[in-house]
From Swiss-Prot:
<feature type="binding site">
    <location>
        <position position="230"/>
    </location>
    <ligand>
        <name>Zn(2+) 3</name>
    </ligand>
</feature>
<dbReference type="InterPro" id="IPR013022">
    <property type="entry name" value="Xyl_isomerase-like_TIM-brl"/>
</dbReference>
<feature type="binding site">
    <location>
        <position position="181"/>
    </location>
    <ligand>
        <name>Zn(2+) 3</name>
    </ligand>
</feature>
<comment type="similarity">
    <text>Belongs to the AP endonuclease 2 family.</text>
</comment>
<keyword id="KW-0540">Nuclease</keyword>
<keyword id="KW-0378">Hydrolase</keyword>
<dbReference type="GO" id="GO:0008270">
    <property type="term" value="F:zinc ion binding"/>
</dbReference>
<dbReference type="InterPro" id="IPR001719">
    <property type="entry name" value="AP_endonuc_2"/>
</dbReference>
<keyword id="KW-0862">Zinc</keyword>
<feature type="binding site">
    <location>
        <position position="228"/>
    </location>
    <ligand>
        <name>Zn(2+) 3</name>
    </ligand>
</feature>
<keyword id="KW-0255">Endonuclease</keyword>
<keyword id="KW-0479">Metal-binding</keyword>
<feature type="binding site">
    <location>
        <position position="109"/>
    </location>
    <ligand>
        <name>Zn(2+) 1</name>
    </ligand>
</feature>
<dbReference type="Pfam" id="PF01261">
    <property type="entry name" value="AP_endonuc_2"/>
</dbReference>
<feature type="binding site">
    <location>
        <position position="178"/>
    </location>
    <ligand>
        <name>Zn(2+) 2</name>
    </ligand>
</feature>
<feature type="binding site">
    <location>
        <position position="215"/>
    </location>
    <ligand>
        <name>Zn(2+) 2</name>
    </ligand>
</feature>
<dbReference type="GO" id="GO:0008833">
    <property type="term" value="F:deoxyribonuclease IV (phage-T4-induced) activity"/>
</dbReference>
Amino acid sequence: MIRIGAHMPIGGGFKRVPKETYEIGGNAFQIFPHNPRQWKANLPKEEDIKLFKEGIKKYKIDPEAMLCHSGYLINIASPNIETWNKSLELLILEMKICSTLGIKYLNIHPGSHLKSGVENGINQILKALNTAMEKEKNTFILLENVTKKGGNIGSTLEELKLIIDKAKFPDRLGITIDTCHAFDAGYDITNKEKLNEFLNKIDKYFSLEKLKFIHLNDSKNDLGSNKDRHENIGKGKIGSEGLKVFISHPLIQKIPWVLETPGDNDVHKKDIQEVLKILEVK
């Protein structure tokens, strides 16, 4: 069975997420654990937790297809000690929120070294991950591939490998592959041969077991553009044919897909329908 969904709103509480996931035709989802544009976060209230978990059971959502996405302000690669400390503190709280909700996976962007260099940035990331994962032992952190702009770390599989190889708790680290980010970073996932090379490299560096989620997005920009601007399914430079190559691969079909395309739930419902149409799923 294909597991597919979208990034879902949480305004008014987490309890809304399972039902709305079902209503858009999904059986997987991603959420923010708090307002992503604020440093402040709170643990959810007991009633919200209860209703959320009841909804998960009611709508039969696989726990392996539930994902939290870290807030936008966190930068655990930062050379600025104040920013790094605030990022670490919020990351730990996000892990607690995930654990409270019964969500196993937290997706994070590795961060930007802000001109301090990749090596220094990776060292900062490792310090943060090691500290956070020592304190919160229930959460599995997924490093998302990004585009190479603004000092971002993780635009290549090699950089993600460096982090996981040196981490204190590699067994609780995995990766998320974002199709827009991969395409914009120069990985041609629209070509069968190149896609196989990409997946073989993932298997060689991490094992495919480490690939836990796909962010399924089209791209507004060309291959290798390093822009990172998501587009709705079939309307971008990856396109329907390119996405068909990617999502038709049997290994990709084993992994949950989450859409982060522009628009609200109604738009995401149409995007999910478009994905299934591309796959020729009735």
